[in-house]
């Protein structure tokens, strides 16, 4: 359970010296009682449910969680007041078709029905046949909030279930591929032990340094700059930080890659980036030690950045 915050890559957390991520990799819950979901590349994010402060049904974007400029839509008139263009058109349909539940949910919008090919963001999804439903939503998060959406607590969602008839009529296609992890963890456990040894040699940077290092690492990934030891030494020198911290970051990133290879997805929807077949954007995995996104940054993040520049 976490506040409604941005999900981190596991390797980025290690930069501050937080070694609980190694417990996250190493926990038996990763393979047994974890909550694993496929990360879908939809847009925009849609939040809907019952507003705890009014008791009314609402839809919105992530702006429903804003501390100041809050945009909660409890009617079509609210949507017209708070939003314009394509986002408003999407929210009008979501207001009509999403289930009016007592809870609070979030999912990514994939598209309107009537086609078999959708590109809401970077990845293009090819469905096996034309979608007959009115809207397509990829649900991923359920929230609890006692009195105000600004205090909402996020919980990862398992298989979706609603009590009304939206699962059997043509209102909503819930796009939620099922993912499993192979129980072959010995190599990951050994590499986590090695990472702990490396951590004993590290002088970890402060919060401001970590933020700057993360931006520079993202820039390298997006611009296809190889993160070899020469690049890491340059980053360490520029940020006046211990080179061993960046070597540890790279090691943890490679452990995450090993984890990715153990995850399988069972779904008949094909994924492409431009003309090249690809896997899903990644996964979100939760256990007793935290919730992290497991994404192939060298593949997806670079493509996402480059396609965003072209639009």
Give the location of each predicted region.
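Core nucleotide-handling region used for phosphoryl-transfer chemistry
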Residues: 1-34, 39-44, 48-311
